[in-house]
């Protein structure tokens, strides 16, 4: 089903991860479309995303699973409609060790587990972002694919999810080497 309420702004930026691409939405600077390679991947991500967003641990969701048309641009190739995905609030990502600290990531990991029972294993800097909540910024999970929660994508190689060592409680240590 093509959602007529939004258009992908193909002339602007886009970003990609291992399982999805993220496109800006035309005339909606704070919304993006997360596109997946198939409907099953989109549905899996949507389920996790919805569970996290319920507790404000992921960007807000603005659509159900759908496809979108690309906005028409003069003198540019007009792609076919997108693959399956959904519209969410834009979360800004940052370079590692800049605006989002290891403590921020660990707090998010702990909140996700406390509120949903999920273990956010793939919690590296490029799988988290910041959203605005009033005048404040909040760190949220932006990779909601099932691989982020299955334990096979352990971003920090600790026995528990997150950058804090489970043994010495430090963020950078040698006790596991």
Residue ranges and their predicted role:
Residues 5-59:
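ATP-binding glycine-rich loop module of kinase domains
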Residues 24-28, 90, 131:
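Active-site beta-strand termini and strand-to-loop segments that position acidic
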Residues 28, 38-40, 66-67, 91-93, ...:
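Short, solvent-exposed loop/turn segments at secondary-structure junctions
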Residues 31, 57, 86, 138-140:
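Protein kinase-like catalytic core scaffold
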Residues 37, 53-105:
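Conserved structural core of kinase catalytic domains
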Residues 39-47, 96-103, 150-152:
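Active-site-adjacent loop/helix micro-motif of nuclease/hydrolase catalytic cores
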Residues 110-118:
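Protein kinase catalytic-loop region centered on the HRD/HxD motif
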Residues 121-174:
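Catalytic activation segment of kinase domains across protein kinase-like and atypical kinase folds
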């Amino acid at each position: 089903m093509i959602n007529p309420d939004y258009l992908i702004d193909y002339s602007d930026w886009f970003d990609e991860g291992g399982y999805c691409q993220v496109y800006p939405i035309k005339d909606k600077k704070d919304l993006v479309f997360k596109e997946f390679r198939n409907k099953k991947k989109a549905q899996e991500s949507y389920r996790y995303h919805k569970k996290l967003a319920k507790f404000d641990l992921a960007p807000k969701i603005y659509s159900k699973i759908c496809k979108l048309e690309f906005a028409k641009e003069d003198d540019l190739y007009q792609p076919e409609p997108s693959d399956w995905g959904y519209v969410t609030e834009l979360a800004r990502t940052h370079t590692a060790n800049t605006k989002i600290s290891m403590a921020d990531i660990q707090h998010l990991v702990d909140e996700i587990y406390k509120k949903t029972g999920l273990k956010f294993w793939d919690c590296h800097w490029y799988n988290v972002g910041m959203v605005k909540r009033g005048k404040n910024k909040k760190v949220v999970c932006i990779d909601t694919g099932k691989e982020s929660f299955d334990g096979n994508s352990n971003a920090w190689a600790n026995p528990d999810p997150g950058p804090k060592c489970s043994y010495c409680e430090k963020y950078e240590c040698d006790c596991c080497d």
